[in-house]
Curated annotation (Swiss-Prot):
It catalyses: Endolytic cleavage of the (1->4)-beta-glycosidic linkage between N-acetylmuramic acid (MurNAc) and N-acetylglucosamine (GlcNAc) residues in peptidoglycan with concomitant formation of a 1,6-anhydrobond in the MurNAc residue. One of its GO terms (cellular component) is cell outer membrane. It comes from Escherichia coli (strain K12). InterPro entries: EmtA, Lysozyme-like_dom_sf, Transglyc_AS, Transglycosylase_SLT_dom_1. It is an enzyme of class 4 (lyase). This is Endo-type membrane-bound lytic murein transglycosylase A. Murein-degrading enzyme. May play a role in recycling of muropeptides during cell elongation and/or cell division. Preferentially cleaves at a distance of more than two disaccharide units from the ends of the glycan chain. Prefers cross-linked murein in vivo. It is a lipid-anchor. HAMAP family: EmtA. It holds the Pfam family SLT. The N-terminus is blocked. A lipid is attached at C16 (S-diacylglycerol cysteine). SUPFAM superfamilies: Lysozyme-like.
Length: 203
């Protein structure tokens, strides 16, 4: 009986540790970042328009599409920043005071895609993530929310947005990453932060 319990404990611990091993397999950011950097003039323009760091935009391009403006995912996320017309695209249109949602050809246009991606990051920062004080924590929260939705992130802290933001403000960047690794329902969430750091280091 003791041996059986010990074996179960080993399996349980292995499962727990693997959940947080978001750095495997290693991601080499060099080539994706090089390809994303060709769009830096557009990223700088969009970043200035929406108050978003162009390096953050470039990192997201490297992670999401590897710099390919024609990239389309299985979930129909399109273009350099992998925007979905019916979700993030619609949110940006609403912010601009427009009806409907962007077309596929619009999302494959590098300038339009990057502009809308920057606008969506601004929507996240000034909306559901408003009030996060630490710049690095905010950066991490932005990319996790960009990839998996702000609601999913905030609910790992509290069902009340203000309480969630308050709890986030009690954490430094490393503590925030550990919280995401332990509590976020999407296993790719902490890996996105890992890829972000790899991309920023490669610039």
């Amino acid at each position: 009986m003791k041996l059986r319990w010990f074996a179960f404990l080993i399996v349980l611990l292995a499962g727990c540790s693997s959940k947080h091993d978001y750095t495997n397999p290693p991601w080499n950011a060099k080539v994706p970042v090089q390809r994303a950097m060709q769009w830096m003039p557009i990223s700088q323009k969009a970043g200035a328009a929406w108050g978003v760091d162009p390096q953050l935009i470039t990192a997201i391009i490297a992670i999401e599409s590897g710099g390919n403006p024609n990239a389309v995912s299985k979930s129909n996320a399109i273009g350099l920043m992998q925007l979905k017309a019916s979700t993030s695209g619609r949110d940006v249109y609403r912010r601009m005071g427009w009806s409907g949602e962007p077309t596929t050809s619009e999302l494959k246009n590098p300038e339009r895609n990057i502009s809308m991606g920057a606008a969506y990051l601004n929507i996240l920062e000034t909306g559901p993530l408003a009030g996060i004080e630490d710049p690095k924590v905010l950066q991490y929260a932005l990319v996790v929310s960009y990839a998996n939705g702000a609601g999913a992130l905030l609910r790992t802290f509290s069902s009340d947005r203000k309480k969630a933001i308050s709890k986030i403000n009690d954490l430094d960047a490393d503590e925030f990453l550990e919280h995401v690794a332990r509590n976020h329902p999407a296993p790719q969430a902490p890996r996105y932060i890992y890829k972000l750091e790899q991309a920023l280091d490669a610039m």
